[in-house]
Amino acid sequence: KIATGEFSKIISRLGGQDNAFTSHDATAYFQRISKDRLRQVMEMEADRMLNLKLAEKEVLTERDVILEERRSRIENNPGSVLDEQMSAALYQNHPYGIPVIGWMHEIAKLSREDALSFYKRYYAPNNAILVVSGDVTPAEVKTLADQIFGSLKPSDAIKSRVRPKEPEHRAARRLELRDARAGKPTLYRYNLAPR
């Protein structure tokens, strides 16, 4: 229903704000809207979960934004480069060793098909959590959620979550990064939490 690039514009026209963030474990989409717009925004999220539209031009534009973000936040910051390399050394068999933003060479190759494949694999009601706060009661939210999301079919592609474990480290892992841009020497020390 909602055309590429229109979601945020609609939220803005409704007097709201929206944004998103990604972590190692989740991607979150959130909106700040008035209570009288809650149903409409929940319907928009249900539509996005089932009918995402991705135009090639939009994907390429967003890919370039991510590349620039990586350059400015990681590549141009020695501390961030070291942090990223430390995580990669610490988590050699776990997804936490992969930067949330991704590696530069992988981002550069991102295509519309890659994005749609990821969407089809992970975006489903049985892989989502709805959180609502504000001037609403749990009963009101549950009624809306049942009406709007209740008929969405779960995805068979979503399997039981695999919780990979990093094998016990038997030797120290040390990294040294020398960078003329670093203002002062810095020591980072990472450890895996005990099981």
Predicted regions and their residues:
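Residues within well-ordered alpha-helical secondary structure of globular protein domains
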Residues: R13, M44-D47, V65, R121, ...
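Non-catalytic, conformational "gating/processing" segments within enzyme and secreted inhibitor domains
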Residues: R63, E113-I148
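Conserved short hydrophobic interaction patches
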Residues: R48-N51, L144-L152
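Acidic/histidine-enriched alpha-helical segments
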Residues: K53-R71, T137, D156-A171
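Solvent-exposed, non-transmembrane alpha-helical starts
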Residues: R39-M42, N76, T143
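Non-catalytic beta-strand/loop surface segments
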Residues: I2-R37, R73-N127, S151-R195
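M16/insulysin-pitrilysin zinc metalloprotease superfamily fold
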Residues: R32-R63
